[in-house]
């Protein structure tokens, strides 16, 4: 194949159009990771699914996506970026339509898995394409644009899904993908070549490597998703999945190092800055997805907010991300990226620490500043991290580097949600015990609460025994609510310390210059 860059003959306007169409496809794929989060109850009722079954609507997507993200590099080399993205957009659109038409929970799980698998191909290819096509100031904007897309989409997902479900029907959270998906599929093939295919690679594909990748990452994602719900390794299914994942990992790494045609190359990790940027991206994914998950859960569980109210509250983080994107891009071209990401991590930690003062009365206005600080900080974190990871990568490794970098953020998110779910449960039980002990040690205070609640209940029932029972039940709910609130505060505080600890890595990163020519993909 030629070393020439096929995009060199394209005008800047055509390059921007290609990149814009692909970035929009990436936004759709990332939005659909979390879009069902605010609508699971409605989907469960609509498909007559059980509590354990409905969780697979999310798990199936994530398991399939995490397998495809690193695999996309090989496939884009084999059939070209243009046709991989087009095929992925087409199948993503069809699977979205079928999710909306799902007739039972089993069909929904199958179509969500296809949706996740095809969506996973669109995420890393956009990063590689952006860095391949542009140079100088335009390339410097790529991390900002894609950073905003990759953080804004999962942040807005629960809000968009909840809003659509409230005003229409849960099926429309999938139907809404159809028109833009058809447009992307129809337009992209005619915009121009990004690279040339190498179909001979398909004849030499190492299927054992592909299979072990699926078993390794799919099993790991299953353990992280299902572990918190089933007491981790005390559950036979989770323990079995963990062992299967370990076996898959052993085979995967053996094939990675010894296969004549590996589907994934780990050579980008030879660059220390790339490796450290991936670790930082893991932490960013941990904080981004965990905080995005925790805030709606708090508002729903403790405050009893509706999907619309939750969406209106968490939308603040998305707005500040949009504001921060051009600022982060500008700073990354003018200031050493290590300073930018250092400030970003400090502000992210500050935003999380502000959440640690949370009370059971917090709503939109109390959450406004912590969310704004966190939303602004995440772009200061991710924009220089993308630049550190992908600037200076050898042309032959750019696709693989992009896939690995994006994989680390998704893994960070999966680990984060699993960990914070476990922490919430453990801390809530601890605080419930402490609050109960405190009330036992202060019987006069507890008696006063019971008397007040009984007097209030007596206004609605003439039977003193019923009123007392209602008062005791209400007290139990109050203790549970306050224990949950204290647990959320503890989790946000621990997350803040994780970001502070990660600052140790930043000084050892060496950002590459952004003013070089576009890299060739071949």
Task: Please tell me what each predicted stretch does.
Residues 2, 8, 39, 410-511, ...:
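Hydrophobic transmembrane architecture of multi-pass small-molecule transporters
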